């Protein structure tokens, strides 16, 4: 063995298994995965193009939606191309530093998505509870600051992880029992004391999910109070109708996060592929359904999409 290999504390590459125990079904599993990824790409790119092209959609709600679409594109594209390469071509190898980069992007953009969903809840709160101050509160400057804060929080919380993982000696082999480089899946291969990584990873996840979800719920408590005080049922229906798309996006994101986290800790003796499939569902489902939710439930988006197709006079 050469001297350069002896000094390495980490392998030059990892091997991603895919879905443990279901390797013989990879080609079939790839079909819904590929379909979901294609829908995510088409849907989110369409949202971005329409919001950019239509000046009437350059409002706070749609600017936050554009942020969400961009995040969903990066989030799904960070894992799905490599995942499909595993399923189709058995291309399981991933460079050590590419693995760390993938892990950083996946976890960072998940945190950014949570922040943007919280910002969208704040947008709905101001629109319904303080409608006369909406344009004064949600200025372009504030929206930019919110976007920068979402990025800064995610990068600050996730930057330590790649550096911590570089310090470990990986004596348990290079095989990761996963479809992508998830933090805890990589930590399991490391020797030595990994307790700080374990605690830090869980603490960050709990902090983000609990804090953001509580603030979202609090926003909707105030929104519900304001809606119930409206004079007519039609006004109440119209006001709350503007929140339906956001509630759908919230449920799509947090439900999958919570189910995946609970199953990972409660059903520890479940087959490995159950946890991996749930983790993939969390990665695929929100980016796929968010454009559909907003396209169907938001009149301005729906009209902009239909306006792309020329109508023939009868």
Swiss-Prot record:
Annotated GO CC locations: plasma membrane
Glycosylation sites recorded in the entry for this protein: 5
Topological domains, Cytoplasmic: 49-56, 123-141, 220-239, 297-314
MF terms (GO), sorted A to Z: G protein-coupled receptor activity; olfactory receptor activity
Keyword Transmembrane among record annotations: yes
Membrane topology, from the record: Multi-pass membrane protein
Spans through the membrane: 28-48, 57-77, 102-122, 142-162, 199-219, 240-260, 276-296
InterPro entries cross-referenced by the UniProt entry: GPCR_Rhodpsn, GPCR_Rhodpsn_7TM, Olfact_rcpt, OR51/52/56-like
Keywords: Cell membrane, Disulfide bond, G-protein coupled receptor, Glycoprotein, Membrane, Olfaction, Receptor, Sensory transduction, Transducer, Transmembrane, Transmembrane helix
Extracellular topological domain residue ranges: 1-27, 78-101, 163-198, 261-275
Disulfide bonds: 99-191
Cellular compartment(s): Cell membrane
PANTHER family: OLFACTORY RECEPTOR 52K2 (PTHR26450:SF404), OLFACTORY RECEPTOR 56B1-RELATED (PTHR26450)
The family this protein is said to belong to: Belongs to the G-protein coupled receptor 1 family.
Function statement: Odorant receptor.
UniProt name for this protein: Olfactory receptor 52K2
């Amino acid at each position: 063995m050469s001297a350069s290999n002896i000094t390495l504390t980490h392998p030059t590459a990892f091997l991603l298994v895919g879905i443990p125990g279901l390797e013989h079904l990879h080609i079939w599993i790839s079909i819904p995965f590929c379909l979901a990824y294609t829908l995510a790409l088409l849907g989110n790119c369409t949202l971005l193009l329409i919001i950019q092209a239509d000046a009437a959609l350059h409002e706070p709600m749609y600017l936050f939606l554009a942020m969400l679409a961009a995040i969903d594109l990066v989030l799904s594209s960070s894992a799905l191309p490599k995942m499909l390469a595993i399923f189709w071509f058995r291309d399981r190898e991933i460079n050590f530093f590419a693995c760390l980069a993938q892990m950083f992007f996946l976890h960072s953009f998940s945190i950014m998505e949570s922040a943007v969903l919280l910002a969208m809840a704040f947008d709905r709160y101001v629109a319904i509870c303080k409608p006369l101050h909406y344009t004064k509160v949600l200025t372009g400057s504030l929206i930019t600051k919110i976007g920068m804060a979402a990025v800064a929080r995610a990068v600050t919380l996730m930057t330590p992880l790649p550096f911590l993982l570089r310090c470990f000696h990986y004596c348990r082999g290079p095989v990761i029992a996963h479809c992508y480089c998830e933090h805890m899946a990589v930590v399991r291969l490391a020797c030595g004391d990994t307790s700080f990584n374990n605690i830090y990873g869980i603490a960050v996840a709990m902090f983000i999910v609990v804090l953001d979800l509580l603030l979202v719920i609090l926003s909707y408590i105030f929104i519900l109070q304001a809606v119930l005080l409206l004079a007519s049922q039609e006004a109440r229906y119209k006001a709350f109708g503007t929140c339906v798309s956001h509630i759908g996006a919230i449920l799509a994101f947090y439900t999958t996060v919570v189910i995946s986290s609970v199953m990972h800790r409660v059903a520890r003796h479940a087959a490995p592929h159950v946890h991996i499939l749930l983790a993939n569902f969390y990665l695929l489902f929100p980016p796929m359904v968010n454009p559909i939710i907003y396209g169907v439930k938001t009149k301005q988006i729906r009209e902009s999409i239909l306006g792309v197709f020329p109508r023939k006079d009868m």
